[in-house]
Amino acid sequence: MKIGIYTLGCKVNQYETQAMEQELTASGHELVDFESPADAYIINTCSVTAVSDKKSRQMIRRAKKNSPDAVVAACGCYVQTHEEEAKSLGIDLLMGTNDRARFLDRLEEAVKTRETVADIDDALRRRTFEVLPAGGMANRTRAMLKVEDGCVNFCTYCIIPYARGPVRSLPMDKAAEQVRALRSQGYRELVVTGIEISSYGHDLKDGTTLIDLLEIIAREGGEMRIRLGSLEPRTVTREFCERAKKLPTLCPHFHLSMQSGCDATLKRMNRKYDTARYYESVELLREYFDDPAVTTDLITGFPEETEEEFGETLAFIEKCGFAAMHIFPYSVRPGTKAAAMAQVDMSVREERAARAAAVAERMHQGYLARCVGKTFPVLFEQDRGEGSVGHAPNYMPVTVDVKGLHNTVQNVRITAVDGDGLRGEPEET
């Protein structure tokens, strides 16, 4: 079959799509562009915000429009949390956020019977980590290693615990095995991902933590760079930093989840830290690493957020001096505690997001400017025009005027800020 795939959402979704792609191609199916005619389409959906829900529905409808006779399959968080709504869209195969290994069987069943197949479990009852094969598509330089699934934080705004279930961790021996496989396939960088990787090991009940896993990954990965997914502030302790500093392949890019810079707002969100603890994590990272890229997420206009509270957040993000930020106006998720709170008008949420974005852009440009004159080992991912584009260890994009550097690491001296990235010159080897 010719199959088109579209993925929305986080790196976990990207990883799970990658696993499905491997299974499909290994079984003789052909992957085609999502906009091309196909026998089947797969949409890996997201439900982190209302916009994500809307995009998921749009892509399902687009698939049906692209090839009216094709089988349309959908999986992921939107399907898991909105099963009945998803069924109303006329999807042929509905699977949630589990049993990726059985996806091909279910897809072939839907193609054969032309009847709707629904296979969605109760996420909150899951207790076992689903191990998927390591690897990816041949033209990619960066592989993802999913080490954890699920979340038990139950932030008042978030639906994801209901979509993904409780914490389940990839056993360390399986992680080591997958890292060796990815290394042998020639990947240059490994992204350690999960729904909430700070909780890695929580379910193993043997004292294992994320830093233990990272040491195993570094040992088995050789020269493969290690990049971390989003971290909770509680992870960043002095012990964590002391041990992480000793891992030569760990990229100094730390996405430290924040959401608000106001203690009262954080409490309403049911976040498990205050601004003092958060800032302690930022300072520890800067103590142990040379000008690391500390990045974050921010929700503006959370229920009951006053102008004074938002002002505290603006002052706090200035204090932290982030290298980059992802900023979202608060999105109501039905069924969450925050949905029942007093809502801030959407125009105010968006206006605050714009104000925060202006501060974030100034800080981002300042961080880029500090990179000028430095030399970074850049992993190049693609040609662009007459040059090549890649990322420095701090995840800043770097462009050079040399083609043909795909999947190589080159030392590059940064000569200028280039929009939202950097420009440089490869050093002579």
Model-identified regions with their sequence ranges:
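Flexible glycine/acidic-rich beta-alpha junction loops that bind and position SAM and/or redox cofactors
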Residues: 83, 194-203, 235-239, 258-269, ...
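Short flexible coil/turn linkers enriched for glycine and charged/polar residues
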Residues: 138-141, 151-152, 250, 260, ...
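Proteins enriched for Cys/Gly/acidic motifs involved in redox and nucleic-acid/cofactor modification
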Residues: 1-200, 209, 239, 250, ...
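Conserved, mostly hydrophobic/aromatic
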Residues: 175, 192, 228, 256, ...
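Radical SAM/AdoMet-radical enzyme domain recognition
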Residues: 184, 211-212, 216-225, 237-296
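Short catalytic-loop micro-motif centered on adjacent basic/acidic residues
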Residues: 73-74, 226-229
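Short, surface-exposed connector motifs at secondary-structure boundaries
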Residues: 2, 67-68, 220-227
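Terminal RNA-binding accessory module
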Residues: 340-429
